Amino acid sequence: MATKIVLVGAGSAQFGYGTLGDIFQSRALYGSEIILHDINPVALAVTEKTAKDFLAKEDLPFIVSATTDRRTALRGAEFVIISIEVGDRFALWDLDWQIPQQYGIQQVYGENGGPGGLFHSLRIIPPILDICADVADICPDAWIFNYSNPMSRICTTVHRRFPELNFVGMCHEIASLERYLPEMLNTSFDNLSLRAGGLNHFSVLLDARYKDSGKDAYADVRAKAPDYFASLPGYSDILAYTRQHGKLVDTEGSTERHALGGKDSSYPWADRTLFKEILEKFHCMPITVDSHFGEYISWAGEVSDHRGILDFYTFYRNYLGGVQPKIELKLKERVVSIMEGILTDSGYEEAAVNIPNRGFIKQLPEFIAVEVPAIIDRKGVHGIQVDIPPGIGGLLSNQIAIHDLTAEAIIAGSRDLVIQALLVDSVNNQCRAIPELVDVMISRQQPWLNYLK
């Protein structure tokens, strides 16, 4: 029988087209049945037509259909891929940033950590739990892959509510290592053995070795990273180029320097001034930039590249939304590799998945979802234990109670636990104003937060 794959949120052209292209190029998934699902029938119909036209043009034997009925879509599913957002993403994100700011709370980014990350979680996790409830009822053995953020809070809450489900979080930040390290170390990516780990958007490179010699490569990373990243262009440079030339910069599969014709950044350590502090003081290289890593650290506001973060937000909101995605027969995300690994019992090592901590990071409890490498075979996704240095472990440990209280607040629908989740978060520097802040957020985001009592 053909493998059945369900895409939840397929009305999003960026998610739908990109994932379809990944699937269509796969030999192991050749001839699969793909069910597109979205609550927006107009957007869903566009994705369906585009997919069918592409299959006809390329003469590929995949079966594609679409439905707005989720339970119908899930019947017989072996794999379910989720990428959803609720409401007007940017309007709600602005509230997540601006309202806490009115109460004296400064945030680096406000999407996945801090107060913004909490309210984002409170909105998006309930509908994901609804999806998971249907999976548990209709296709409980299916593997579920999630691309939605805030990743670690979503995965933690889902596994608390549905511990029996095969739910895996996927993020592409790990791909930064493939973009930068070969150029930095003057070797091919295939010659590097790498391990990274932590929490989603809060992970660091832990080990690096040259395969041909077996020698430690991390010493070279620490020695060469300062000069390399100090001159690497960032989003301020990309935004300026886009405004000047009226076209987007394509950094997929290459560095920003190559995309901008070999130019250096207009200022040092673009997007990475917090990154620089972590590298210098903790001797570990983050696998992401300040906008993500800084969301979880109370002192990040002092040292983050705010110019780069604001320019990234502007670029993301004003330019990326206008890009017309297309279906291409090339692998862009790693979820297809995992599905292939399960179907073929390959036993390959996947660089990063978000799964419950089953002793993979000793400084963290079992309930929290961690980002670690994993072995993929016919039995599924098996995390690999990693050694986290004490200092990084301390930063990660600050998230334990936040994730615990976020999950409990959502499952119980508890306003009091939301207040507590804010009060244990070191990004928050307020106390008496927090109950009022929570009430204002519930009022302003009533369609999504009215379950909190």
Swiss-Prot record:
UniProt keyword list: Calcium, Carbohydrate metabolism, Cobalt, Glycosidase, Hydrolase, Iron, Magnesium, Manganese, Metal-binding, NAD, Nickel
Molecular function via GO: alpha-1,4-glucosidase activity; metal ion binding; oxidoreductase activity, acting on the CH-OH group of donors, NAD or NADP as acceptor
Regulation of activity: Is inhibited by EDTA in vitro.
UniProt effect for mutating I174V: No effect on catalytic activity
Catalysed reaction, written as an equation: Hydrolysis of terminal, non-reducing (1->4)-linked alpha-D-glucose residues with release of alpha-D-glucose
Described function: Alpha-glucosidase with broad specificity. Hydrolyzes maltose, palatinose, maltulose, trehalose, trehalulose, turanose, leucrose, sucrose and maltitol. Is not active against alpha-galactosides, e.g. melibiose, and alpha-mannosides. Shows an obligate requirement for an O-alpha-glycosidic linkage, since it is not able to cleave beta-glycosidic bonds (cellobiose, gentiobiose, lactose, sophorose or laminaribiose). Cannot hydrolyze phosphorylated alpha-glucosides derivatives.
Name assigned to this protein: Alpha-glucosidase
Gene of this entry: palH
